[in-house]
Design a protein with these regions (language model features):
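Long, C-terminal-biased catalytic regions of enzyme "large/alpha" subunits
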Residues: 2-101
Length: 101
């Protein structure tokens, strides 16, 4: 099932440092799209409320860092931690394996 949410409410003005050194704007929607694919692959359904909770938790964890740049591998760690804490272990495992680019 697709996670349908998020209008980057309370957006974060931050750059993501990609593995090749490029900088890219942080976009929660891009993360949500990746999680949609992971939930489909894990055959685990996530509803809109789940999506909002996941997004909120990820954004909260990022804000706590109080940085204007974050490495993509650190961002990945935060996403996986949030998924596991919210009980989406299977999706966290698929996401972890699938984002090795």
């Amino acid at each position: 099932m697709y996670i349908r949410s998020n209008k980057n409410k309370g957006g974060i003005n931050m750059k993501v440092i990609k593995k090749d050194g490029r900088l890219q704007e942080f976009r929660i929607r891009k993360i949500i799209l990746s999680l949609e694919r992971a939930s489909d692959e894990a055959r685990k359904s996530i509803n809109e409320s789940d999506s909002e909770n996941i997004s909120r938790m990820i954004m909260s964890e990022i804000r706590k860092l109080a940085v204007d740049k974050i490495e993509s591998n650190k961002l990945k760690e935060i996403i996986i931690k949030c998924l596991k804490e919210l009980g989406f272990t299977a999706i966290a495992e698929v996401y972890s394996k699938g984002s090795k680019k």
